[in-house]
Amino acid sequence: MHDVTVPDVNIGVVGHVDHGKTTLVNALTGTWTDRHSEEVKRGISIRLGYADATFYRCEKCEGTEAFSTSPDCPACGGKGTPFRSVSFVDAPGHETLMATMLSGSALMDGAMLVIAASEKCPQPQTKEHLMALELVGIKKIVIVQSKIDVISQKEAIDNYHEIKAFVKGTIAENAPVIPVSSQKGINMGALVQALDQIIPEPERDPDAEPVMLIARSFDVNKPGCNWKDVKGGVVGGSLIRGILHADDKIEIRPGRQTQVENRIKWVPITTTITSINAGSKKVETATPGGLLGVGTRLDPALTKSDALAGQVLGHEGKLPPVWDKIRCRVTLMERVVGATSELVIEPLKHSEPLMLSVGTAVTVGVVTNTKKDSVEIQLKRPVCAEEGSRIAISRQVGARWRLIGMGVLGE
């Protein structure tokens, strides 16, 4: 029997900076995902934020009023029945943080595209994030028209038509548009119902070898704590397939960098799982869907400050290969989106530096060989990925990395 309080999917929250993504996650979960001091100061998300919500259905109410993320029904005050939990991945909307958004997209089973009704649609990062969802293959999308409390009904309807015109011909063409006010809690039931219908739990293979994409890693020890109380390093991310158990012997790849006879080598890290947290619950067994915190016996110095973000965790000797040079089939977009002027995208050139997002890993590489639609790239940092993985490709345009297309690894 599935525990309804353990999240079964990850839902990305994407869109332009300051369109209300973090406020929306707070309204749904009660968690403010900007915990980083710099984020609070600047009022923008810098790292990926995570929060879980349980969906409740009230048996007395009908339609959208029956749905909420609160045990007490907001419409009638009766008791709601919990039927499902989800994890939200709050991605930064600022153009300089596109790499962070792309690394988060690897964890997403579906996404909410948040568009503020108070601004003209589309804004630059609204375009860029929708293009990113299209490139990494996220098809299950709910569009959230936010901030409807600060505009008139006519402006909201005009903005709705702008949104529909913008998504025409994209993967979000048939996505529902849900108008909400996160500040006032308006229409949250309709949003919960739409998320439940559009982003169901995907089919999972429980017998597959486990593969967990690491998006965060940390040292949970307080400065100056007694050495007897020191806890091992913790990694956070999402299990994309298979099952993990407490006490499993695991390997993390590419691992850590070492120098052997003046050559840099990457050595896989092996350790044992000491604890697993799914959402805020301690569990013995982890299944795909939702975000996990995995406690290990690693030296916390190895995991502090997201040092292992972008790596892959699984059973010893069973992980996908590690690549320091890749060949991929490339599909480039026609124009650069997200910039003020939309430049035509030129073909990839020999010796050109590129930023590649593979799973949760973000690495830089240099083009060593180009053919008609395939390219070879020498990576600065190796990545652990399966053949056939999708790779988001960005190039420097002006002083920014801009998304220009996608590749398929090893073709």
What are these regions (language model features)?
Residues A116-S118, K139-I157, V177-M188, G310, ...:
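G-domain G4 guanine-recognition motif of GTPases
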Residues N10-V13, I151-Q153, D299-E411:
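C-terminal effector modules of nucleic-acid-centric enzymes and ribosome-associated factors
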Residues H2-D3, A165-L308, V312-L319, D324-L332:
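Conserved catalytic-core segments of large NTP-driven translation/proteostasis enzymes
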Residues D18, L24, G43, D90, ...:
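Residue-level signature of catalytic and energy-coupling elements of molecular machines
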Residues M1-A99, M108:
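P-loop NTPase switch module centered on the Walker A-proximal segment
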Residues F83-S87, A91-L97, A106-E128, E134-I157:
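Conserved Switch II/interswitch segment of TRAFAC-class P-loop GTPases
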